[in-house]
Amino acid sequence: MIFSAAGAVLIAAVKRVVRIIRHLPKWATAVFWFVFTLPLPLQAHEFWIEPSSFQPDPDQSLTADLLIGTDFLGAPAIYVPDQIEKFVLLGSGAKSQSERYEISGRYGDRPAGKMTSGSPGLSIIVHQTAPIRLTYSDAKKFDEFAREKGFDDALVQHQDRGLPLSKITERYQRYAKSLIAVGGPEKIGAGRDRHLGLAIELVAEANPYQWPPLQSMPVRLYADGEPLANAQITVFTRHNPRHVEKAKYQTDRDGRSNFALLAGRDYLVDSVILRPMDGAIESSDAMWESIWASLTFQVPKNPKM
């Protein structure tokens, strides 16, 4: 499925917004982006990390946007400390504190992440949001979101639990990773992604930056530390800013899936778990919980020289 026309419209809209806010004072810009991004999860928008370079030099200054959008086209969120539980850069094979860089900022910063790329090898940018509670205005919006993410019977489950169809509440949390290849030609393909123990996590089981480029990417989905079988994974392939292709896959019994790669493209892999919250009828807590995983990387068109 290709999103050319829709992508062009969204890009034009975002550019118009950026032109407007460019002339606002910093505090007004921060407020605008905070308000602008609040309602986006209601339309099941993805959340992902996009670094300023997927292949930086060692110790290069680097930024990372936290993007909220759909079909790999989105608006950058601002840095809001209260909405962040984890924001780190993990160096290649990072097991010691010296190879772990905490990413911090000031309220309203955009891009939200500023860092130094660090030592050569495959590094991982990790972002975990704080839990956020939302309310769907009607059952149709909830059903559309659930079906898009592979939970066709969620609304039936909701009714079977005796819950109201108006003002359906959900608590959601996001877990995003981005893979970057740091260093010159001598480090092409060095390092690997790894399971970090996030509540939901996508792990690339091959290095996307190796040369010659990979023909396909094996990924594994984990939930609560265990491989997750029979789960939907959505892959967005960005050929250029106005040409994004979307495909859906299912994990096997070991939580694995595999999809084709093309050189010179950016990739966003997304998966969501939607599950009922226990005791939602008796308590004031949300009726549903969703946890989101995303993984971004690039497949190089030419070897880095």
What spans do the regions from the language model cover?
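Bacterial N-terminal signal peptides
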Residues: 27-39
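Sec/Tat signal peptide C-region and signal peptidase I cleavage site
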Residues: 40-44
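Beta-strand-rich domain onsets/edges
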Residues: 45-63, 153-217, 222-227, 239-242, ...
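Short, ordered, surface-exposed loop/turn motifs in non-cytosolic proteins
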Residues: 80-82, 226-237
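Short amphipathic beta-strand segments in non-cytosolic proteins
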Residues: 86-95, 232-248
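Glycine-centered loop-to-beta-strand initiation motif
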Residues: 109-113, 247, 251-265
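Short, aromatic- and glycine-rich surface loops/edge beta-strands on solvent-exposed regions
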Residues: 121-132, 267-273
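Short acidic/polar inter-strand loop motif in beta-rich domains
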Residues: 130-138, 275-280
